[in-house]
Amino acid sequence: MDIHRCRFVPYNPQAINALAFSHPPSLGLGGKGVPTLRLAVGRANGDIEIWNPMRGAWFQETVLRGGKDRSIEGLVWTLDPPETGPDGQQQAGRLRLFSIGYSTTVTEWDLEQGRPKRHSSGNYGEMWCLAAQPRWQAATGKDNKPLPAAEGEYTGQHLAAGCADGSIVLLSTADDDLKFLKTLRPSTKRPRVLSVTFQNRHTLVAGYADSSIRVFDIRSGQLKRTISLGKGPTGGSKELLVWSVKCLPDGTIVSGDSAGEVRFWDAKNYSLIQRLQSHLADTLDIAVSADGETVLSGGADQRTVVYRKKSGEKGDKSSRWAEVTHRRYHTHDVKTFAVYETKNLSIVVSGGPDASPVVLPLREFGKEHHRNLPSLPQVPPVVSSPSSRLVMSFWDREVSIWRVSRGPTSLHEVPDGQRHRLVGKVMIQGEENITSATLSSDGKILVIATVSSIKVFSVRRRKGDDRGTLRIQKLDTPETISEDGARLVTVSPDSRWLCIVRPNNDICLARVKPASSPQEKTQVMPQLVNLRRAVRHARFEKVSHGTLGGYERTIRCIVFSHNSNILASGDLSGCIDTWTLEDAEQTTIKKPNTNADADESSSEDEDDYAAVEGQRWRPIASDSPIPRLKSSVALLSFRPPSPAQSNTILTNGTSASKTISAETRLMAITTEHQLVEFDALQGKLSEWSRRNPRAFLPADFKGVRDRAMGCLWDFSDSRERIWLYGTSWLWMFDLRQDFPSTEELNEVVAAEANDASDQQTQKQSQKRKRSAQDQDDDDKRKKKPNSGTGAGGQLPLAQSDVFFDSKARAFVGPDASQGEIVSLGKERPVDEEEEDEEFNENNEIQLARVRRENAKSGSGDSNQLVSTSTPARRWWFTYKYRGILGIVPLSSKSADLDADTDADADGEASANTGLEVAVIERPMWDVDLPDRYVREYE
């Protein structure tokens, strides 16, 4: 594979200003979080990223795009009260997301459509902070049963926003709305409100810019107490800025100020309990654990400091807070925290101007690794036109196109000048950021979409320009297409169909007429073909978990087959829908309904299956679609046509003579890194996918933490490879082979059988206590890549801050003749989902073994045909690339080749030439960050 390492794309990751989990910490909840748990990440350009923790896997599901001069400075989630359904049962309330951004407006976001749902603004100052009222908890009666809410009691959550004019605005979220409730003002003095939190459902605590903390009763609107922090340090400002206030479960107030101090205040009389000086610069944010035993602070000195309660000496029941440790996980300010905890999960996420969210273990701090989440988007904002050697990238409201020249083909050839050149640039009008952009495979059509509009451009090379500059001209787009925006756009490989995924996840297709001569323009037909997805049953959600509505049906990816005759889409719920293009005269549409409802919707069906220039799109097996996958669909890609013959013999002895056509095989990569290949026309698994379940994947691949971003195909007469890549890794699988091979699998089965018989014999012969080495070996064998409390894996003892192991040997008796291994750490309860996964994995292994045996017996003497040749490498991987923005293919057969070139010779050369790609990197050390605090020794 020929690789061009490119760092010329000036993509600028934006600072993280706000973090918020959709659910509050709950130590009484088992497992690693509820299914609806999400993390919202607010950035300085107005984008909001929605991350799914996935019990430690961390997957970026979608991005809510911002706009010009917009910023996210605060994020909160609320849960609406449950409603009573028609059947009398309670239905889960909706989870709602709100944001502020240095304006007088609070914005509610529509997660299903990916754009703002409503705004609330008023005659008050700019909002600097935002907090949500704690969720309503039912009181228990004498029989320990929950009591209903009192008459007239509001069980929802109000919002409190602190403003620059000193006021605190209360907003009501009742009745699925956002309305002004009241304003809290301390006095005639108007200091900025820098931080706000709730001590309980009726008490509000706010930090100001005048060295004070004020406590309000939101029911009466009265000021209960003003807490003074005193003067600032000598040589600095007289007034302290209270950047953060948080409350422990017992009501204790914790504050962080511009002097770098963390102070603890009594919950009842609001007196100072303790003050700690742990930062060299401002303390910007504070995080507290669910049990109130751990506090974290982040500052402008890049430090993350951990405090824990230290019990007094014997006879002293009082406890004091002490700094346990501090460390620099960020290269810039630590600006914001978000905490989530259950019985099995305990994490805190931090962020700042260095753009990378950092996941830290909270309960197991010092015993587990931290983890840096990617700062780059997980849907690559880069597309290429291989034949034209054009690379397109977009960010904010800008699109840039580069031309990558060919490298030297031999050691004696001298490269001529610059290897890349900027040949085109587009700045779109309006305020919305670009949601999606694509370049056709021939490099002649450019499509740019925002949340409110779609623009189509023709791309041509300027005549007489030796530099290869492009002429980008806007085309007349019909109103049926441009009047609404899109979350995804793509162009078919033959450049005849434009696919649009609307913000509400409706799929539309428009016919494109390419220009037949240089004097003509490419035309986009006004008629839209609306495609319907198969109806799927929604997953049941518990009332306490809340619901995200139709957010799970958000389309993650959409792709055409290589002959442009099949279209496939995948969504966050794991559903895959497919459609095929057929001649209108030969297509007969089956009406699923035969009652009166069918007559009413007949006109809609005709529009959905309307013919365009004699062709019609229809769903494939709408009555029995492809089964839903276990996790979200991360990638979809059709297998390209292989130049090899259909009777190719696999190197592990399996005949491919009966395999399905390569044009219809669809590869799906899930967020759990499961590779599933379907026949798109028949809706069944391919033979390769049947023989290779996820349990057979290499252990190194299953241990990869960053999720896959994209894939490339490398097909020729001698190889069938798929290349997967993430932010920091690149992996190759040879699809002509199974992994592990049949011989290796038989050896594993025999070894497992021998181990089982040996263990049974040992149990019958003697019973002994397990040694420490046996116990450690079992622990290492049982650990999974995403084990732990949600951050990184277990820290080795030599790198741990705890300085003692998690196990010790306890001796019984005066002569120490009996010993027992005792665990010093708290044993976490077993996760039921992990037990189910292990059970399903064992079933998949047994089923795959049977399929391989059947394939081997059906292939006859095929083993003898390949026994003389050495099998090629089944997989390969590397971690040498950092900050991968995307990897795009390039073609050695360019559109600029002379017309006299022999087509057959070119086809033979391209079939035998290796894959050529451009690896676009954007490491953080190449990004210009704002000024930061400089320490004395720097």
Range-by-range predicted roles:
Residues 2-30, 38, 45-63, 78, ...:
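Long, low-complexity intrinsically disordered regions enriched in Ser/Thr/Pro/Gly
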Residues 35, 92-96, 128:
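N-terminal intrinsically disordered, low-complexity segments enriched in Ser/Pro/Thr/Gly
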Residues 122-126:
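Asp-box/WD-like beta-propeller blade repeats and closely related beta-sheet repeat scaffolds
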Residues 128-263:
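Solenoidal tandem-repeat scaffolds enriched in leucines and small polar residues
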